[in-house]
């Protein structure tokens, strides 16, 4: 049976894609046939191959399965703004059924699929629906990425509470150090570990060379994470 995980963040720019690539690398190293799925992406560039989003390209590059770009990212928008605004501006609706259809198309070729959201948990996809609605519809276990910085504790606890109130499994969380280590960073992480009931999968350190060595090409991220706790969360979900 295909394992499916949804990656959300406590905010925009907290490192969801870095964490997603690390998870894909770790799962691939354990022998899984992996596929990254970024169903909706805004903030893209026009290339010779068409509109391309850097986050989606990173997921494509870190998937063990050979996937076409449109399989990884069926909804690509040019402007870097909330998907529901980009959707209205470009006149392209984002039906939840289409997101599910794209996911189903990946399942035959992969046994470990990582789905990366856009922005935070309640990011709107239309005036009526949010990403959270789709995740709840699909009953996906969730991995939360926390960008460790001032304010992250409140954002993380609110996001974790919303996920659990939706009746979904918060399978784990990743601490991503988005800035160089500050005076209180270790205390932020200790507080998060104590107050978030889900297990910590690992800490990704601040990557000072991310511009010169982007996640599209680097293969040194998977060792920061421990997937054994995900297997435990999966067993717990089955037994519920």
From Swiss-Prot:
Pathway: Cofactor biosynthesis; biotin biosynthesis; biotin from 7,8-diaminononanoate: step 1/2. GO terms for biological process: biotin biosynthetic process. Pfam families: AAA_26. Its main location: cytoplasm. Keywords: ATP-binding, Biotin biosynthesis, Cytoplasm, Ligase, Magnesium, Metal-binding, Nucleotide-binding. Its EC number is 6.3.3.3. Catalyzes a mechanistically unusual reaction, the ATP-dependent insertion of CO2 between the N7 and N8 nitrogen atoms of 7,8-diaminopelargonic acid (DAPA, also called 7,8-diammoniononanoate) to form a ureido ring. This is ATP-dependent dethiobiotin synthetase BioD 1. The gene is bioD1.
